[in-house]
Amino acid sequence: MEHFFSLLVRSIFVDNMIFAFFLGMCSYLAVSKNVKTALGLGIAVTFVLVVTLPVNYLLQTKVLAADGILGIDLSFLSFILFIAVIAAIVQLVEMIVERFSPSLYASLGIFLPLIAVNCAIMGASLFMQQRITLSPSDAKYIGDIWDSISYALGSGIGWLLAIVGLAAIREKMAYSYVPAPLKGLGITFITVGLMAMAFMCFSGLNI
């Protein structure tokens, strides 16, 4: 249980997908103009992560690994199978959002189906694949399906916090004076840089 919470906290603050690895930046910058829309996308990304990572973990350890049920090393297929799982889950999320929240579906536009190619989702699966091979004494080690869920949930929450935080700041900046050369993406990149520097203070935590 201690390792479960350690993975959760580390993936939110220390190994944040946005501020530590710069993954998922396209939708992060494009959909962070409104807090409500950013929150909706953040929840969708978190849901996709929490569902896809355990499925991909089971695929990697029980099917693709040399000691899996097939007895053949099929790890070379992991990339394409991970993408297939992610695409299927994103399609499910898109159908659910369109059914229960048409306004959110309309505001997210093309960025909802693009979750399927959000590098934060694929990156989390590849990091998970890498962490399976680490020593059990390593704080980043993923040894069972619960560890994969913890890592997925933390990665999703970290991404959600990052996009909602930026959206809140950008909403305030809309009513603030910004020099003409910095308007738009200029001031946004500066803001993201300052937020990343703030998250760097967690990098020394030994969790």
Named regions from a protein language model:
Residues 6-20, 72-86, 149-162:
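Structural signature of hydrophobic alpha-helical transmembrane segments
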Residues 6-47:
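Juxtamembrane transmembrane-helix termini in multi-pass membrane transport proteins
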Residues 22-30, 94-100, 111-112, 119-138:
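Generic transmembrane alpha-helix signature in multi-pass membrane proteins
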Residues 23-27, 45-51, 83-92, 117-124, ...:
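Hydrophobic core segments of alpha-helical transmembrane domains in multi-pass membrane transport
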Residues 23-37, 90-104, 166-177:
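C-terminal ends of transmembrane helices
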Residues 37-47, 77-82, 104-115, 181-187:
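Cytoplasmic-side transmembrane-helix entry/capping segments in multi-pass membrane proteins
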Residues 61-108:
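Ordered, amphipathic secondary-structure segments that act as subunit-interaction surfaces
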